[in-house]
């Protein structure tokens, strides 16, 4: 597939997601990094968003709970280029009923080339990168060219 670039502003749109067994880790991570996160627009799936907001007083745009469609909503925002970074603490040792949604979310994050961290170590590296507060260009699929070729 051909690619193009999209401009990402210095203020990022960051998605915060965590499975039940990982919510406490994400909340603690957010508390530790509140000084970084407060400079960005934050989104989260339902329960996670409310818990983070309560623990940190950060403003969170909460979507539906993951199993109720929040993962799908987040995937749609990624495909619409409305999410720039995703922090997703998931539990590789426990299957969840909405596992296909989780896999779809991870896939769409990879397709649209958004930086995403799936554990504390990678989240720390990502949030502490000098690029997190800078304008950047991301290489993404050129959907218009793809569509034009398919419609010929």
Curated annotation (Swiss-Prot):
UniProt-listed InterPro entries: Methylgl_synth, Methylglyoxal_synth_AS, MGS-like_dom, MGS-like_dom_sf
GO BP terms in the entry: methylglyoxal biosynthetic process
Annotated HAMAP family: Methylglyoxal_synth
Enzyme Commission (EC) number: 4.2.3.3
Binding site for substrate: 19, 23, 45-48, 65-66, 98
Known role: Catalyzes the formation of methylglyoxal from dihydroxyacetone phosphate.
Pfam families hit by this protein: MGS
Taxonomic classification: Bacteria, Pseudomonadati, Pseudomonadota, Gammaproteobacteria, Pasteurellales
Cellular component, GO, one term: cytosol
Keywords, comma-separated and alphabetical: Lyase
An example Gene Ontology molecular-function term: methylglyoxal synthase activity
Residue intervals of the MGS-like domain: 6-152
Name of the gene: mgsA
UniProt cross-references to SMART domains, sorted A to Z: MGS
Family statement drawn from the similarity comment of this UniProt entry: Belongs to the methylglyoxal synthase family.
Protein name: Methylglyoxal synthase
Catalyzed reactions per annotation: dihydroxyacetone phosphate = methylglyoxal + phosphate
SUPFAM superfamilies: Methylglyoxal synthase-like
Organism: Mannheimia succiniciproducens (strain KCTC 0769BP / MBEL55E)
């Amino acid at each position: 597939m051909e690619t193009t670039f999209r401009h990402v502003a210095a203020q990022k749109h960051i998605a915060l997601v965590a499975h039940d067994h990982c919510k406490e880790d994400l909340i603690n991570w957010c508390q530790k990094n509140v000084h970084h996160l407060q400079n960005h627009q934050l989104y989260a799936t339902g329960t996670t968003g409310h818990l983070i907001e309560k623990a940190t007083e950060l403003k969170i745009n909460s979507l539906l709970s993951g199993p109720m469609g929040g993962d799908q909503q987040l995937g749609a925002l990624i495909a619409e280029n409305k999410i720039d970074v995703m922090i997703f603490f998931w539990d590789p040792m426990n299957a969840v009923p909405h596992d296909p949604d989780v896999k779809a979310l991870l896939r769409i994050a990879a397709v649209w080339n958004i930086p995403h961290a799936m554990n504390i170590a990678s989240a720390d590296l990502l949030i502490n990168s000098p690029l997190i507060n800078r304008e950047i260009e991301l290489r993404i699929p050129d959907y218009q060219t793809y569509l034009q070729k398919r419609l010929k």
